[in-house]
A protein has these predicted regions:
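Membrane-helix interfacial "entry" motifs
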Residues: 24, 28, 54, 58-66, ...
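Short helix-terminus and kink motifs of transmembrane alpha helices
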Residues: 14, 78-86, 90, 99, ...
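Alpha-helical transmembrane segments with an aromatic anchor "belt"
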Residues: 58-126, 134
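N-terminal juxtamembrane cytosolic/stromal segments of multi-pass membrane proteins
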Residues: 1-56
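Transmembrane alpha-helical segments of multi-pass membrane transport proteins and ion-pumping complexes
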Residues: 44, 48, 78, 82, ...
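Interfacial aromatic "cap" segments that immediately flank transmembrane helices
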Residues: 28-35, 96-118, 147-154, 160-194
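A generic short alpha-helical patch detector that favors 3-5-residue windows
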Residues: 8-11, 76, 80, 157
């Protein structure tokens, strides 16, 4: 009986292990980079939402900066995290290759890539209110409801992306899901520390550059 062909972008939602098995021998491709870029854009949009209402950024500026800087940051983060997880997996007795790790990080973020479409739709309907942590009192009830639904959907899709990545690491590393979750958490901690270190170096070499690029939280 012939095996049903795999459709990675669709099947990864509910059959991640099979998807990552099928991708195990595939080289890194344009889809991996596009998914990483989409994840970076989504993260930048989420950061802009933490800015205070007195920043006076327009929707066009927010979307433009997110598409430009977020896409680059997403792809750079893909390679950074792939190197980290590749080394952690090897130390834990895993058997993955770098392309396999990249596939897990990229295709495991498909739900987050889907959240980007929700961000865009919310921005079109709600305007600048979509990027304010606390809506103004004069914002219409429908817009407030839309913003709450957008936040809830983002959190749920983020959690599902984490689940997919953990299951992916379990599959490619040949380890139990619990151990794969510990590997994922440790990798995130190391990735944060490395990113912080790199940010300090960039700030020392190019003062003020990151303040211009990265959205800053303002209470």
């Amino acid at each position: 009986m012939p095996t049903e062909p795999i459709r990675p972008l669709k099947d990864v939602w509910l059959r991640p292990r099979r998807v990552f098995r099928e991708l195990a021998t595939c080289p890194v491709g344009i889809t991996d980079y596009l998914l990483a870029a989409a994840q970076g854009v989504g993260n930048f949009l989420a950061l802009y939402r933490t800015e205070g209402p007195d920043t006076h950024r327009g929707v066009e500026e927010i979307l433009g900066n997110s598409l430009a800087y977020g896409a680059v940051a997403g792809v750079a983060s893909l390679f950074l995290m792939a190197a980290i997880y590749r080394r952690l997996g090897a130390r834990a007795g895993g058997k993955s290759t770098t392309p396999q790790v990249i596939h897990v990080l990229a295709y495991g973020s498909v739900p987050l890539a889907a959240s980007l479409a929700i961000w865009m739709l919310t921005a079109l309907l709600a305007g600048e209110a979509a990027f304010v942590d606390t809506p103004r009192p004069d914002v219409e009830g429908f817009v407030v409801l839309l913003l709450h639904l957008q936040v809830i959907s983002y959190v749920l899709l983020l959690v599902w992306s984490i689940v997919l990545q953990v299951m992916g690491f379990s599959e490619i590393q040949g380890m139990a899901t619990r151990k794969a979750f510990g590997l994922w958490v440790l990798g995130q901690i190391i990735g944060f520390l490395v990113s912080l270190f790199l940010a300090l170096i960039i700030e020392a070499l190019f003062p003020g550059l990151l303040l211009h690029i990265i959205p800053q939280h303002r209470p």
